[in-house]
Amino acid sequence: MNLSLRLPRPFLLAALCCLGLSSCIVRMPNPAQPKALPNQSNSIDSAIRESTVPIYLLADSLHTSLALPYDWLIESGYTPPANLKFSPGPSRYLIMSWGDRIAYEQRRWLRPTEVFYALCMPSPAVTEVIPVSWKVEEVCYQQRIYRREIPQSHGRPLAHFLNASNRFDAQGQPRVIGPSSWGQGVLVDSPHSYYFPRICNVWTAQALESCGFSINIRKAIHANSLIKQAQKQGFSWVHRGHAKSRYGRDAAKPRDL
């Protein structure tokens, strides 16, 4: 997703004003109500009692997404877009994120006016769904990647949240509006509006929350703030990525490095 934040000063001032107006509606409506996730100190005991699955948190300079096991999502009740095609490979994951429709559809940097309207005015949003059949670290090698095992039973509230992020057609299938910004995935129409501060990282934060994590949504607007919350709850940094900005791979180092 391409989103340039180099705005003229009037646009920046307008964005700050918009923050005050919209701060009370940061969340997506109707999030799933999960059960609490066990503390990391009890994760081994939890794994003995119940099978676990890996989930991945991905981040570049500003944007976050999730990589989730496809078969587990289906078993948990997630309704995928029709005709997703997985290439031959050892595993099946969906790379998923949410955001402004224009930003996902464009193949160029957004103009300042487009950024202004995307951030400050309620605009159409999409969920990007990309099937991959290989190691997440190798497919998304440019991004910082964090991994955590969670109980399989936490998939149902997550599937509920993911389904609620999509608009469905008359046949009960997610309404596909175009190809994904990369890979062989799709963009799915979302019923929720995009604006600041309800941005991509809020969607990611609420998805993690639906898995049972304790996330402060207002502190998750910036990618690094969300990552730090995830690390405190057991996400381990498994791939450094290749981001080369002060917001990139070194901006949210694990505490033990």
Regions found by a protein language model. Give the residues of each.
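Glycine-rich catalytic cores of cysteine/serine-nucleophile enzymes that process amide/ester linkages
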Residues: I55-R148
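Internal catalytic-core helix/loop-beta-alpha segment
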Residues: R147-Q171
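C-terminal motif of bacterial Sec signal peptides marking the signal peptidase cleavage site
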Residues: G20-S23
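Activation targets extended, charge/polar-rich intrinsically disordered C-terminal tails
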Residues: I25-A32, A164-L257
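Long, compositionally biased charged/polar accessory segments in the mid-to-C-terminal portions
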Residues: I44-A47
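Core subunits and conserved enzymes of cellular information-processing
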Residues: I25-M28, P34-P38, V53-P54, L62
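Second-shell loop/turn segments in exported
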Residues: C140-P151, V188-Y195
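Bacterial N-terminal signal peptides that target proteins for export
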Residues: N2-L12
